[in-house]
């Protein structure tokens, strides 16, 4: 369903365009030059779509046979614009088809002004301009060269396989190794420079080297303090054991002395 409706403020212009379209469609099919008579005869033969023909409609003089369709040679000229101060209608471009094809419809405006040879030249010029705009590869591409003999093949292989500098067998080139080492060292340096500010930031979660050092030092100090405390405790406990032993020895000596004294007293009493 189309929502568009033709404007009503330019009815003569619309009528002119409609008449032009009918003229062109007839010229594309038939070359009799009388589209009005041809269309009227067809309407009398097939009837008016949507209803019967009214009684007052003009006829073609009783001839119900339409004219024979002729070969379209050249399109008819454009009808004259209506008289009066009417807005100009769209211009008719081109001269229609050719002698071998069906005429009437225009060839598409500016395209009809070029011949076949002109189009080919134009396309070739555009292609050449596009090739000139394409940047050349740098360095230029090296295409393979055909080998004509075995000696030429061997010489080309030897030239391509010779190293730039002298190196030991089963090892790569010295310059290549040096370049790799330099590249790896540069990458390591970049990584260190990238992670060092992030690790030293106050709110960062990365482990810092200074923090690790502090924790290791604190652990070592705690261990040393524990060892010292244990040594002091052991030193304090040893004299106590010695005192206990001395007390036991003194008690044993006193008990032996008392037993000896008791024995002497008993012997003296027995002798008396």
UniProtKB/Swiss-Prot annotation:
Keywords: Phosphoprotein. Residues 249-272 have a biased composition (Low complexity). Residues 78-90 have a biased composition (Pro residues). It holds the Pfam family DUF755. Phosphorylated at C-terminal serines. The keyword Cell cycle does not apply. Residues 218-230 have a biased composition (Basic and acidic residues). Residues 231-246 have a biased composition (Basic residues). InterPro entries: DUF755, HEV_TT_vir_Orf2/Gyrovir_Vp2_N. Residues 50-116, 195-272 are annotated as: Disordered. The keyword Phosphoprotein applies. Residues 94-108 have a biased composition (Gly residues). It comes from the Viruses. This is Probable protein VP2. It comes from Torque teno virus (isolate Human/China/CT39F/2001). The lineage of its organism: Viruses, Viruses incertae sedis, Anelloviridae, Torque teno virus.
């Amino acid at each position: 369903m189309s929502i568009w409706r033709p404007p009503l403020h330019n009815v003569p212009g619309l009528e002119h365009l409609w008449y032009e379209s009918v003229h062109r469609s007839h010229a594309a099919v038939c070359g009799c030059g009388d589209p009005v008579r041809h269309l009227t005869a067809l309407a009398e033969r097939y009837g008016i779509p949507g209803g019967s023909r009214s009684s007052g409609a003009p006829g073609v003089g009783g001839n119900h046979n339409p004219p024979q369709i002729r070969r379209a040679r050249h399109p008819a000229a454009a009808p004259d614009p209506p008289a009066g101060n009417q807005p100009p209608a769209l211009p008719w471009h081109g001269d229609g088809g050719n002698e071998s094809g069906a005429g009437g419809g225009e060839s598409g405006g500016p395209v009809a002004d070029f011949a076949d040879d002109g189009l080919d030249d134009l396309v070739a010029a555009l292609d050449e301009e596009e090739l000139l705009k394409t940047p050349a590869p740098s360095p230029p591409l090296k295409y393979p060269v055909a080998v004509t003999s075995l000696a030429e093949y061997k010489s080309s292989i030897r030239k391509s396989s010779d190293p730039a500098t002298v190196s030991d067998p089963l090892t790569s080139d010295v310059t290549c190794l040096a370049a790799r080492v330099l590249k790896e060292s540069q990458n390591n340096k970049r990584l260190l420079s990238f992670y060092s500010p992030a690790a030293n930031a106050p709110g960062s979660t990365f482990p810092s080297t200074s923090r690790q050092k502090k924790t290791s030092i604190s652990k070592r100090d705690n261990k040393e303090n524990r060892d010292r405390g244990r040594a002091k405790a052991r030193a304090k406990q040893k004299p106590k054991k010695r005192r206990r032993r001395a007390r036991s020895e003194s008690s044993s000596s006193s008990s032996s002395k008392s037993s000896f004294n008791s024995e002497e007293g008993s012997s003296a009493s027995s002798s008396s």
